[in-house]
A protein has these predicted regions:
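Non-ligating segments of multi-cofactor redox enzymes
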Residues: 1-200
Length: 200
């Protein structure tokens, strides 16, 4: 049985948002809702300024907080993928409150929780995930063999109890200050002029 794991190289990401668009198109996510979001952080002062990017999606956590929070038994993990059973989900939003990076939303039309599932339907057909296939910078990779994990890849933890399956390379740790429990990926939830800038 394959165990899928995503590697995100933030050092390669150019912030083009192609992964977000590909994901929305693949899953027909409602307007204003995202399974994937590329965050960015500006730092420095003119003329020495820098912008870091960080593609974020469900990190397919081990012992996932959302799984433990779901009282309906709608969330499970198999093959390295944290899955939501649509037939059991009631849209109660307990999983949203539990996720430390806001990777889950409830579809307003179906009242069912949705998030990244590593494009499981594509992987089963031997295809790349929509985001990996679309990334122009080759910043996203899915591996099934531990030997293929770069030594510099590590979990991007936003909470002490997080156990991300997805690993990041070169992620700016200050971006953790921009993430909040229970706030789903959406431009409606983030004021760009505030969360994009490092005020420290």
């Amino acid at each position: 049985m394959k165990n899928y794991q995503m590697i995100v190289d933030a050092q390669k990401c150019v912030g083009c948002h192609a992964c977000e668009v590909a994901c929305k198109q693949e899953f027909k996510a409602p307007l204003g809702y995202f399974r994937t979001m590329t965050m960015y952080l500006d730092s420095g002062t003119f003329p020495k300024v820098k912008r870091d990017f960080l593609p974020l999606m469900c990190r397919q956590c081990d012992d996932a907080l959302c799984l433990k929070a779901c009282t309906k038994g709608a969330i499970s993990k198999e093959n390295g993928i944290v899955k939501i059973d649509e037939s059991k989900c009631t849209g109660c939003k307990d999983c949203i409150k539990a996720c430390s990076i806001g990777a889950i939303y409830v579809n307003p039309f179906t009242n069912i929780a949705e998030k990244c599932n590593l494009c499981e339907h594509r992987l089963e057909e031997g295809l790349q995930t929509a985001c990996e296939a679309t990334c122009v910078a080759n910043a996203i990779t899915i591996v099934t063999d531990k030997k293929d994990i770069p030594k510099e890849a590590k979990p991007f933890k936003n909470h002490k109890d997080d156990k991300p399956g997805t690993l990041h390379i070169g992620a700016n740790e200050k971006m953790k200050n921009k993430l909040t429990f229970g706030r789903s990926f959406s431009p409606l939830n983030y004021e760009i002029e505030n969360w994009a800038v490092d005020h420290e």
